[in-house]
From Swiss-Prot:
Function, as annotated: Involved in unsaturated fatty acids biosynthesis. Catalyzes the dehydration of short chain beta-hydroxyacyl-ACPs and long chain saturated and unsaturated beta-hydroxyacyl-ACPs.
Swiss-Prot/TrEMBL keywords: Cytoplasm, Lipid A biosynthesis, Lipid biosynthesis, Lipid metabolism, Lyase
Organism: Rickettsia rickettsii (strain Sheila Smith)
Keyword Flavoprotein among UniProt keywords: no
EC number: 4.2.1.59
GO biological process: fatty acid biosynthetic process; lipid A biosynthetic process
PANTHER family named among the record's database cross-references: 3-HYDROXYACYL-[ACYL-CARRIER-PROTEIN] DEHYDRATASE
Protein name from the UniProt record: 3-hydroxyacyl-[acyl-carrier-protein] dehydratase FabZ
Length: 145
């Protein structure tokens, strides 16, 4: 099931310039999700990171993983209209390859565990088949107040 950017914005609250998932390529609710982020030189982070050699910040790769996982949570629950997804922990984040404008980040997230409102994930970002980043993280799903 492919989910385009318009539908992604129905499932998570992020917007430009902080929406870091362009398309969902595959989703298996309650299990895993795969999506992409096309990295372009027009993104605001590249004005300072770094002007002479733009490099995608590692924290934004982790954020892209978390946003993709939030889409998986929303699809698994059927809706998150009355809920919010908050990142609780980031563990073992590793950055193995530079990501730069022109690259397509292929992001994959897997649910490792889900208990009540706490969800644990493993995620990777690959570019041209090489692992660029990997991380484990935990998110909490809370009712909106």
């Amino acid at each position: 099931m492919i989910i385009d950017i318009t539908e992604i914005m129905d499932w998570i609250p992020h917007r430009y310039p902080f929406l870091l998932v362009d398309r969902v390529l595959k989703i298996d609710p309650n299990k895993s999700i795969t999506g992409i982020k096309n990295v372009t030189v027009n993104e605001p982070q590249f004005t300072g990171h770094f002007p002479a050699r733009p490099v995608m910040p590692g924290v934004l790769m982790v954020e892209a993983m978390a946003q993709l996982a939030a889409i998986l949570v929303a699809k698994s629950l059927g809706s998150t209209k009355n809920k919010e997804v908050f990142l609780m922990t980031i563990e073992n984040a590793k950055f193995r390859r530079i990501v730069q404008p022109g690259d397509t980040m292929h992001i994959h997230a897997v649910i490792d565990q889900q208990r009540a409102n706490v969800w644990k994930f493993s995620s990777t970002v690959t570019v041209e088949g090489e692992i660029a980043a990997e991380s484990k993280f935990t998110a909490m799903i809370k009712d909106k107040t």
